[in-house]
């Protein structure tokens, strides 16, 4: 089944290359869980989401469990598409509403039933909201180095 799934995805142009095709085939020989992230920066998914949704559905039909990960925390930060202007911050109630609307759209493509392959909706706000800024800085700040992310060329 795993080889058939991979061949189907390749035939459809959905796999261009793979680091270790044999290892991937071996991993898919038993049921796995896989996720795709969706940012709720609008009340609806867009056409660009369709391809990954169809891939999730194909994996589900092949016996695997999809986990659509909705970035509720990311949605609160706002849409980064306007690179030359400050992001518009979204209200938590608005983002919560968008998450619910997106789930309804996801339910039209993937199965959220209690079956072994039933999709599980995850929201990164569930595990990021309880973390305070101080906790985050203590846990992450001690192992990340800002100077590595700054440009070496200081010209603006």
Residue ranges of predicted features:
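Divalent metal-coordination and catalytic microenvironments
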Residues: 9, 46, 121
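Short secondary-structure capping/junction motifs at helix and strand boundaries
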Residues: 107-122, 148
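Short, hinge-like loop/turn segments at secondary-structure boundaries
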Residues: 83-88, 138-141
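N-terminal catalytic cores of NTP/NDP-binding nucleotidyl/phosphoryl-transfer enzymes
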Residues: 24-80
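Non-catalytic terminal extensions that flank enzyme cores
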Residues: 1-40
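Conserved small/polar residues in nucleotide/adenosyl-binding loops
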Residues: 146-152
């Amino acid at each position: 089944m795993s080889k058939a799934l991979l061949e189907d995805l390749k035939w459809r142009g959905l796999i261009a290359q793979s680091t270790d095709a044999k290892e991937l085939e071996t991993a898919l020989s038993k049921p796995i869980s896989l996720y795709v992230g969706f940012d709720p920066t609008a009340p609806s998914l867009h056409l660009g989401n369709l391809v990954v949704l169809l891939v999730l559905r194909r994996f589900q039909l092949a016996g695997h469990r999809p986990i659509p990960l909705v970035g509720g925390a990311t949605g609160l930060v706002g849409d980064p598409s306007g690179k030359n202007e400050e992001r518009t911050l979204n209200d938590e109630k608005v983002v919560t509403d968008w998450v619910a609307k997106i789930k309804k759209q996801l339910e039209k493509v993937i199965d959220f039933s209690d079956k072994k392959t039933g999709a599980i909706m995850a929201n990164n706000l569930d595990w990021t909201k309880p973390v305070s800024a101080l906790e985050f800085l203590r846990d992450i700040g001690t192992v990340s180095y800002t100077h590595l992310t700054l440009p070496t060329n200081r010209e603006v």
